[in-house]
Amino acid sequence: MAFKNAISWFEIPTTDLSRAQKFYETIFSIQMIPFDTPNFQMRMFPVEDMMNGVGGAISKAEGFYKPSATDGPLVYLNANPDVQNVLDKIEAAGGKIVVPKTQISPEFGYMAVFVDTEGNRVALHSVPQ
């Protein structure tokens, strides 16, 4: 058996949902989609086909998880066509670049790592077109 996608959903924790939403909307030039329940608040990343692709969100859920710049899994967000286009917006939006654009290999493209406004370590990935 093989997965269609190894990841089906991800959540990036926030302490200030509005600040995090502004950060991610700025660096990716997107509009996030609100999804709130009595137990948590989310702002989902827009994707072409949420039911068959990989989706994710920034999320605020008291006591469920906390931001970390050093611990836990490292999520790689799609930065196609070029990681640098997103990196150029990180610091002005309130984040910090911790690994600059770095080539993985010619066929696997580039990666970078930043810390967002909430203190989360998040990675970027782009593949040569």
Question: PLM features: what roles do these ranges have?
Answer:
Residues A2, E11-V54, S105:
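Core segments of cupin and vicinal oxygen chelate
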Residues F45-M50, F114-T117, V127:
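Active-site beta-strand termini and strand-to-loop segments that position acidic
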Residues A20-Y24, I90, G119:
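Conserved active-site tyrosine of GNAT-family acetyltransferases
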Residues M1-Q21, P73-V75, H125-Q129:
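N-terminal beta-strand motif that seeds the catalytic metal site of vicinal oxygen chelate
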Residues I7-T15, F64-K89, Y110-V115:
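Vicinal oxygen chelate
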